[in-house]
């Protein structure tokens, strides 16, 4: 039994061991079919079809305003925070349509963590930042919380840097450390999927490298979907890449193929810098 459920059973509607039909010998974690999304009268996503594999890094690239961030925010339904949003189509997560209004968004966010563009630690201690999620899910035992905090900080490759200052305010960390703390906070709820929306765009090159190395470690246990403007980053760290343009998926393939032999001229034009 995991640390998160050792103190109190967390009730969810999704079975973490559900299996989907394999694609390239992988199981599908998200299967998006005929997704359309509007902000009011603006048609932001158009007929999106993507099958995203488990325990891979999937990069979403494309110019500003192409729908990258909108798409990733549909995967945990954060996009619904915009009052004028409406959608058609389906997004199945382990066989369940998350866009169905009967689907509990709280359950989804237990399985799907999110890391944002700018580090956003809570105005709390380092310890409390990581313990917050487990506490919300009913974990009260101090020993169990201590174990979760250490495991999560180790998973985010920041334990050795903060183990002697856990009671200090998280705002005292550097930008790169804050982002890794946010990743640790995400890991503490034991998600299956980690969504990353431009997670290194506000960081210096050294901190960016640390995050990229961490992503490669995390994909052994998690499915990672990352939005990035940095095409070199996408080429370095992802297994699959989707190129978005004007709200559409132009091309989705193995990253090596996208960057060396794209099948669509628009993809080649974008990655070669002819526009964007």
Curated annotation (Swiss-Prot):
Which keywords belong to this entry? ATP-binding, Cell membrane, Membrane, Nucleotide-binding, Phosphate transport, Translocase, Transport
Kindly give the SUPFAM superfamilies that the UniProt entry links to this protein. P-loop containing nucleoside triphosphate hydrolases
A GO CC annotation recorded here is: plasma membrane
Membrane topology value: Peripheral membrane protein
Q: List the disulfide bonds.
A: none
Q: Which GO terms describe its molecular function?
A: ATP binding; ATP hydrolysis activity; ATPase-coupled phosphate ion transmembrane transporter activity
Q: What Pfam families does this protein map onto?
A: ABC_tran
Question: What are the BP-aspect GO terms?
Answer: phosphate ion transmembrane transport
**What is catalysed by this protein?**
phosphate(out) + ATP + H2O = ADP + 2 phosphate(in) + H(+)
Q: Which residues form the ABC transporter domain?
A: 23-271
According to its UniProt record, the EC number is: 7.3.2.1
Q: Per UniProt, where does ATP bind? A: 62-69
Q: What is its main location?
A: membrane
User: Where is it localised?
Assistant: Cell membrane
Q: Which InterPro entries match?
A: AAA+_ATPase, ABC_transporter-like_ATP-bd, ABC_transporter-like_CS, P-loop_NTPase, PstB-like
NCBIfam families hit by this protein: 3a0107s01c2
State the protein's purpose: Part of the ABC transporter complex PstSACB involved in phosphate import. Responsible for energy coupling to the transport system.
Subunit structure as annotated in this protein's UniProt entry? The complex is composed of two ATP-binding proteins (PstB), two transmembrane proteins (PstC and PstA) and a solute-binding protein (PstS).
Similarity field: Belongs to the ABC transporter superfamily. Phosphate importer (TC 3.A.1.7) family.
Q: What is the protein named?
A: Phosphate import ATP-binding protein PstB
Which organism was this protein described from? Oceanobacillus iheyensis (strain DSM 14371 / CIP 107618 / JCM 11309 / KCTC 3954 / HTE831)
């Amino acid at each position: 039994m995991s640390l998160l459920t050792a103190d109190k059973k967390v009730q969810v509607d999704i079975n973490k061991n559900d299996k989907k039909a394999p694609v390239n010998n992988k199981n599908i974690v998200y299967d998006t079919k005929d997704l359309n999304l509007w902000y009011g009268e603006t048609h932001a996503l158009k007929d999106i079809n993507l099958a995203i594999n488990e325990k891979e890094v999937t990069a979403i690239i494309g110019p500003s305003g192409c729908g990258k961030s909108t798409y990733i925010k549909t995967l945990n339904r954060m996009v619904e925070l915009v009052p004028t949003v409406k959608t058609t189509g389906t997004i199945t997560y382990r066989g369940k349509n998350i866009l169905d209004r009967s689907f509990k968004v709280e359950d989804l966010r237990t399985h799907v963590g999110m890391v944002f563009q700018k580090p956003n630690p809570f105005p709390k201690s380092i310890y409390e930042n990581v313990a917050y999620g487990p506490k919300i899910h009913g974990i009260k035992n101090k020993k169990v919380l201590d174990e979760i905090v250490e495991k999560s900080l180790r998973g985010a490759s920041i334990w050795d840097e903060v183990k002697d200052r856990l009671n200090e305010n998280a705002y005292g960390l550097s930008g790169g450390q804050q982002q890794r703390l946010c990743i640790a906070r995400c890991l503490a709820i034991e998600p299956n999927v980690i969504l990353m929306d431009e997670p290194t765009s506000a960081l210096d090159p050294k901190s960016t490298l640390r995050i990229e190395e961490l992503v490669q470690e995390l994909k052994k246990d998690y499915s990672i979907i990352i939005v990035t403007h940095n095409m070199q980053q996408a080429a370095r760290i992802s297994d699959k890449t989707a190129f978005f343009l004007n709200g559409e998926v132009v091309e989705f393939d193995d990253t090596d193929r996208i960057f060396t032999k794209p099948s669509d001229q628009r993809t080649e034009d974008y990655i070669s810098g002819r526009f964007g």
